[in-house]
A protein has these predicted regions:
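Polytopic transmembrane helical bundles with strong interfacial aromatic enrichment
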Residues: 1-268
Length: 268
């Protein structure tokens, strides 16, 4: 449980760093959005550590990530040497260590990268660590397997949530927040552009419309549209899982899912 809470804290600090770098909440808004990226693309030097809050957050992120790696190693050691050996949990613990090492290497090798793929790697890796560490913290309940329909819907919902997380990360890392105003506007712009699927390539550096007075990435409309539509589809799948849990008398789990979904929709 400690590792799961620590990973959740790391995810929060990482999100703060990512959104601060993008310029969300900057002044004067919205003309300041993406100023760091635009300065780098002009060849100017940018030191976001000059902002004390960002510098402290980056230091906290490194300390927390190092602590999480140590905890993951201890978890793996404990599960791999346990008697009797639980192969499933040992494999999960080793996967947790592998993911932590991957994220550590990604951070070292891509510290100044402007590619959305790097942000997606950090985001999805962090969520994977959170899911695995939470699963390791959950108590075993033998003989309490979920019915086939509930298990299938849970798998579908998890897949949709992962896709939704990736699309949200792509919108953020592509500086697409100002690409369109609402769902209909995003769909109209994406249709007007001929549904440009190559713009979803995370290995493309974001580019701004030089003719616009605002820092708008016109290629971000499709990602925005998919993210908004995906939110509806993923929410419906999660609600189906919550309903199935409620029918199985798992009312606490069902209520937790609905609460988390409500908080996410309110935040979005």
């Amino acid at each position: 449980m400690l590792c799961a809470l620590l990973v959740l804290l790391i995810a929060g600090v990482s999100a703060f760093l990512r959104l601060s770098k993008a310029g969300l909440g900057c002044e004067p808004w919205p003309s300041c959005f993406g100023e760091a990226l635009r300065a780098l693309q002009r060849g100017a030097a940018v030191d976001d550590n000059a902002v004390q809050t960002v510098a402290l957050a980056r230091l906290a992120h490194r300390l927390l990530a190092s602590t999480a790696l140590v905890l993951a190693l201890l978890l793996a050691l404990g599960h791999c040497t346990a008697k009797p050996l639980h192969k499933g949990r040992a494999a999960l613990a080793l996967g947790l260590v592998a993911t932590a090492l991957f994220l550590a290497g990604l951070g070292l090798l891509t510290a100044n990268s402007r590619l959305p793929a790097v942000a997606l790697g950090n985001l999805l890796g962090g969520f994977a660590m959170l899911a695995v560490s939470w699963r390791l913290a959950a108590p075993e309940r033998p003989g309490d397997a979920a019915p086939r329909a509930a298990a299938l819907w849970a798998l579908v919902a998890c897949g949709l949530v992962v896709i939704q997380v990736a699309l949200g990360g792509l919108v953020s890392a592509s500086h697409a927040s100002l690409s369109c105003a609402d769902s209909l506007d995003c769909l109209r712009q994406a249709a007007r552009q001929g549904w440009p699927w190559p713009t979803l390539n995370p290995w493309r550096e974001p580019a701004y419309d030089v003719a616009s007075a605002l820092p708008i990435n016109p290629a971000g409309a499709l990602a925005q549209a998919l993210h908004r539509v995906g939110a509806i589809v993923a929410s419906l799948a999660v609600l189906v899982v919550a309903w199935l849990l409620h029918r199985q008398a798992e009312r606490r789990a069902a209520a937790t899912l609905v609460l988390l979904l409500s908080l996410q929709l309110a935040a979005g």
